[in-house]
A protein has these predicted regions:
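Helix-loop "lid/cap" segments that line or gate small-molecule binding pockets
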Residues: 4-5, 61-62, 98
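Interdomain hinge/lid region at the active-site interface
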Residues: 8, 27-92
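Short secondary-structure capping/turn micro-motifs that flank functional sites
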Residues: 21-22, 35, 78-79, 98-99
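Amphipathic alpha-helical interaction segments
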Residues: 14-17, 73-77, 94-97
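Conserved anion/nucleotide-ligand pocket segment
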Residues: 2-11
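Small-residue-rich helix-loop
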Residues: 10-23
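NAD(P)-dependent dehydrogenase/reductase Rossmann-like domain
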Residues: 80, 84-114
Length: 114
């Protein structure tokens, strides 16, 4: 949401105020939305590598139980890509940098999401 809002020219205040009345408003948005908007990935609440590890274990447990979690597996892969891009020791919200990197490399916003 933040990536799209910034691309559309919305201010942080307008985006966060608008998000409050939608399903996008969550603990994470309330506590980290402003950090993502400002691209302030330090200080951290938890490292991206730790979030990736937790997602990896979660997907493995689901697979062992015969449960399909394709969205969770996709997130795990995004966190792995962010770690491999060098963001592993930053705040877990730095996964957002994949979108910024793709845009700076001339990719469309959809490409890093596939």
């Amino acid at each position: 949401g933040v990536f799209l809002a910034k691309r559309m020219g919305l201010s942080e205040e307008a985006f966060l105020n608008g998000a409050k009345s939608t399903g996008a408003w969550s603990y994470q948005m309330r506590n980290s939305g402003h950090k993502v908007f400002a691209e302030a990935f330090l200080p951290m609440r938890g490292t991206l590598d730790n979030a990736w590890k937790d997602m990896k274990f979660g997907v493995e447990m689901a697979e062992e139980a015969g449960v399909s979690c394709p969205a969770f597996a996709m997130l795990r892969d995004r966190y792995k890509a962010a770690s491999e891009a060098g963001y592993g020791e930053e705040d877990y919200i730095s996964v957002y940098r994949l979108l910024m990197d793709a845009e700076n490399d001339g990719a469309t916003a959809a490409e890093p999401c596939n």
